[in-house]
Amino acid sequence: MDKLKISANGPLNGEITVSGAKNAALPLMCAGLLTSGTLRLKNVPMLADVKTTQKLLQGMGARVLTDNISEFEINGGTVNNTCAPYELVRTMRASILVLGPTLARFGEAQVSLPGGCAIGSRPVDQHLKGLEAMGAEIVIEHGYVKAKGKLKGTRVAMDVVTVGGTENLLMAATLAEGTTVLENCAIEPEVVDLAECLVKMGAKISGIGTSTMVVEGAGELHGCEHSVVPDRIEAGTFLCAVAITGGRVVLRNAAPKTMEVVLDKLVEAGAVIEAGDDWIAIDMRQRPKAVDIRTVVHPGFPTDMQAQFMALNAVAEGSCRVVETIFENRFMHVPELNRMGANITTEGNTAFVQGVEQLSGAVVKATDLRASASLVIAGLAARGETVVEQIYHLDRGYENIEKKLGSVGAKIERVSG
């Protein structure tokens, strides 16, 4: 099993190109099931979850071609199987996103209940409740969601803000008969990206980027070409890496308007940030200052950046609180950071961080995707060698992270065994 060996190597300097967002690419790929035409996606990150989604769509009969760099062609005209099996779905929660489009287009779908990151309960009840409101008959048998029926437009008020639920119901509504009003929608950039692609495919959607979207059902959708929005979490991870080591790095193919609260927190920590339409520059010349974090739904501070800022705060000047309001059980990186010399205590959904001057390298285990990133960041500033094990989590969300960090001066290598 691969692992990363990391040693501090001074400030980082240079340029990094940000990949497309995995959390946008996966629902966009599933949207290919809505049409018999060809959906051409650009700026797709070549990640494990993307490859799993490719296999899932191909298993359903879709024709999926890729240049294995950043482009995909998905043709749903050959779909001949409406079942998404456990073997593929078990590794990735986003697999549930085939449910809405498959049911809407074919009148039936069978999808195994998903797996994915071990960071607490992330139920799909809002997905199912919304589809039932639109006329679907749904039962859960032997670990599978079995749905059938012709979908009709209606008002769906989600009980909680859910990104995946919003995406699933939005895709389903594009082919439902009549008008669907989706209330309490997630407004993350990845949801907006999906909606904008669906409009290119012929969907009629108003209220994009707001908590209420109105969808006029279309008889059918067609193919289109779409570029995946840049990954704001990958960008934020690299910015935290520079903030902890010092240096100056420019991120290309970035989307600063999608991550303003993260940039504000970096400035609060002592970084100098500049940004244009598609680039971000960070200049860090001092020990970071501790910053309080409270995760909330977009446009607030993203839960997917909490662990990275925990690593930054671990060596910051002063003390702070980190409050996690989105997921329970998302402090699994704390014991590993403490093994490296951090001074972090937790109480419920709050972590109390007292910054230390330096961390010490250690053998640490990644427990989920963003926890992995926090350990990499910590290793870049620790005295001695850090070995991050179980990095298959990291590969689910970061494309060539060791090569990208290495290109700006980090001492980091992937080793097998």
Curated annotation (Swiss-Prot):
SUPFAM superfamilies for the chain: EPT/RTPC-like
Q: Name one GO cellular component term.
A: cytoplasm
**What does the record give as the active site?**
117 (proton donor)
At the top of the EC hierarchy, this enzyme's class is transferase
InterPro entries hit by this protein:
Enolpyruvate_Tfrase_dom, Enolpyruvate_Tfrase_sf, MurA_subfamily, RNA3'P_cycl/enolpyr_Trfase_a/b, UDP_GlcNAc_COvinyl_MurA
Which Pfam family, giving just one, matches this sequence?
EPSP_synthase
Recorded metabolic or biological pathway in which this protein acts:
Cell wall biogenesis; peptidoglycan biosynthesis
Q: Which residues carry this modification: 2-(S-cysteinyl)pyruvic acid O-phosphothioketal?
A: 117
The positions annotated for binding UDP-N-acetyl-alpha-D-glucosamine are: 93, 122-126, 304, 326
Keywords, A to Z, come to: Cell cycle, Cell division, Cell shape, Cell wall biogenesis/degradation, Cytoplasm, Peptidoglycan synthesis, Pyruvate, Transferase
Cite the binding residues for phosphoenolpyruvate.
22-23
- Looking at the keywords, is Membrane present? no
* MF (Gene Ontology): UDP-N-acetylglucosamine 1-carboxyvinyltransferase activity
Recorded catalytic reaction(s): these are:
phosphoenolpyruvate + UDP-N-acetyl-alpha-D-glucosamine = UDP-N-acetyl-3-O-(1-carboxyvinyl)-alpha-D-glucosamine + phosphate
Task: Identify the domain of life.
Answer: Bacteria
Q: What is its main location?
A: cytoplasm
Report if keyword RNA-binding is assigned: no
Q: Name the GO terms of the biological process aspect.
A: cell division; cell wall organization; peptidoglycan biosynthetic process; regulation of cell shape; UDP-N-acetylgalactosamine biosynthetic process
Q: What is its EC number?
A: 2.5.1.7
Report the subcellular localization: Cytoplasm
Role description: Cell wall formation. Adds enolpyruvyl to UDP-N-acetylglucosamine.
Family the entry assigns: Belongs to the EPSP synthase family. MurA subfamily.
What name does the UniProt record give this protein? UDP-N-acetylglucosamine 1-carboxyvinyltransferase
- Species source reads Neisseria meningitidis serogroup C (strain 053442)
Q: What is the lineage of its organism?
A: Bacteria, Pseudomonadati, Pseudomonadota, Betaproteobacteria, Neisseriales
